[in-house]
Structures are given as C-alpha cells and as structure tokens.
A protein has these predicted regions:
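Pepsin/retropepsin-fold aspartyl endopeptidases
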Residues: 1-119
Length: 119
C-alpha cells in the first residue's frame, strides 16, 4: 500500500528503534488516519484512546521510545518504506504521534538516517 504524504526532512530529527536499529520516520496520525487500512486504524485509534488491547500480529507493531521537548513516550510503529521520486528506502518503521494541535506543515517527518537510505 502506498500512502502519499507531505514529508518534511528535518536534519535535527533522529529516531531509531532500539532493538533492531531501524530508522524511524514520524507520522502525524490524524493527518493520515482515513488513508490507513482498517486494521491499522482500529489499533491506532485504540492506542491513542489509551486502550491496552494487544495489536493484531499481522500489523508487525513495534513500540519506539521517543524523547522530545514534550517529554518521553512510547510510539506505536509499523513497518514502512520511504519513497521520494524514484528513490526508495525500505526497512524503516513509521511511528505515529498525535500532536495537539496538529502541525499543518508536515504529515511525515524524516531525519538524516532515513535520508541516507535513499541514496
């Protein structure tokens, strides 16, 4: 499934899944919610409503620790790939956040680690 998004390359952004070392991109969940498959939507709706229900195994959910100026949290992440034009980087994770208020400047944020995979 492809999900076109408004991406923003932030050279100061760095997020990795600590167990695998995979690069992580950050996605604003409200901006893409209606474009995600139903199973992902249901799980993420529950996550952001503070449900403790486990994710369906087929989603391949990872929990990624995140530290920012807003504090520390765990973000749900799904396997993903990043494509910019003809360049494609697989083996990434897309972590979902639900900022208040949402930032209209971007839907997906990626850092240097993900950008290097596109080369």
């Amino acid at each position: 499934m492809q999900l076109p998004v408004q991406a923003f390359h932030d050279t100061g952004f760095a997020l990795q899944e600590p167990l695998s070392g995979k690069a992580v991109v950050l996605v604003q969940y409200p901006a893409v919610r209606h474009r995600l498959p139903q199973a992902a939507r249901q799980y993420l709706d529950g996550w952001f409503a503070h449900s403790t229900a486990p994710p369906p195994p087929e989603l391949g959910v990872h929990l990624v620790p995140c530290r920012s100026i807003h504090g520390q949290s765990m973000l749900p992440a799904l396997p993903a790939a990043l494509q910019l034009g003809k360049d494609r980087a697989g083996g990434l994770l897309a972590a979902f956040c639900c900022p208040t208020p949402p930032d209209p400047a971007w839907e997906l944020l990626y850092g240097e680690d993900a950008a290097q995979l596109l080369l």
